[in-house]
Amino acid sequence: MRSYGKEKKLVFPYVFIACCFFLAIFGFCFFNLFSQGISFSEIPTTRRSVNDETDSLDHGSSVSNIPFHGLSWNPRVFYLPNFATKQQCEAVIDMAKPKLKPSTLALRKGETAETTQNYRSLHQHTDEDESGVLAAIEEKIALATRFPKDYYESFNILRYQLGQKYDSHYDAFHSAEYGPLISQRVVTFLLFLSSVEEGGETMFPFENGRNMNGRYDYEKCVGLKVKPRQGDAIFFYNLFPNGTIDQTSLHGSCPVIKGEKWVATKWIRDQTYD
């Protein structure tokens, strides 16, 4: 005859040991997050928008700790609060102001330089910045994205004044529009150099497949919106891992209603870029 009482006595210690084991694992994970300076509010989450109410974190230029939020998986967008210091942002603006020129955008078939000169921007190589600020920012971008720096284009520093916007577009190149491609833009990294009092959001109208019914007005400011806040950054993927363009990566800049918007963009290619 089997003794069920003895089996119950034997089962209890194993259950207790298993519980202790899982509690130990949880405790280790919690301690690991805590030791890296990551709070539960900073664990990647999906958000419909980001604005001034985002929890404020201490600014810092350290590259050892880069907190982030996952804003969306379609497209893959990540938000990095306080990525650069106020001093770094203002130094980049001061450097760029006297050098701004009409933007020279990549031209599609049928476009001319005259039709795209609505913005003023500056392409700046890190080795042309004697202060070392851009080099420090680029080093942090490399740690955040895990892409080698020889895949990077030069910084594109762009200023939006009152009423200026950037209609929805792709940073990746469609070969049908631009012709044969030598390389492709995999990632766009965008650093907000200034806060904007009203308007100026970076928006993704096709987030999670919304507005993709063929009737979307490319001048409308809809979808996932990220309000510019000085020192914060976002980066997003323009391509899927198989190299095809992510159609939901369509993005633009809403009109500036009050204030001025400064951004520094770093495009990252899929191979070494000169």
From Swiss-Prot:
Enzyme Commission number: 1.14.11.2
Tissue: Expressed in epidermal root hair cells (trichoblasts) root hairless cells (atrichoblasts).
PROSITE patterns from the UniProt entry: FE2OG_OXY
Family matches, as InterPro entries: Oxoglu/Fe-dep_dioxygenase_dom (IPR005123), P4HA-like (IPR045054), Pro_4_hyd_alph (IPR006620), Pro_4_hyd_alph_FE2OG_OXY (IPR044862)
Cofactor note: Binds 1 Fe(2+) ion per subunit.
Residues of this chain annotated as glycosylated in UniProt: N242
Enzyme class per UniProt: oxidoreductase
Subcellular location, principal: endoplasmic reticulum
Gene deletion effect: Reduced root hair length and content of hydroxyproline in root cell walls.
Residues holding 2-oxoglutarate: K261
Transmembrane portions of the chain: 11-31
Domain Fe2OG dioxygenase: residue ranges: 151-270
GO molecular function: iron ion binding; L-ascorbic acid binding; procollagen-proline 4-dioxygenase activity
Family statement drawn from the similarity comment of this UniProt entry: Belongs to the P4HA family.
Primary role: Catalyzes the post-translational formation of 4-hydroxyproline in -Xaa-Pro-Gly- sequences in proline-rich peptide sequences of plant glycoproteins and other proteins. Hydroxyprolines are important constituent of many plant cell wall glycoproteins such as extensins, hydroxyproline-rich glycoproteins, lectins and arabinogalactan proteins. Possesses high affinity for leucine-rich repeat and proline-rich extensins of root cell walls that are essential for root hair development.
Name this polypeptide is given: Prolyl 4-hydroxylase 13
Organism classification: Eukaryota, Viridiplantae, Streptophyta, Embryophyta, Tracheophyta
Gene: P4H13
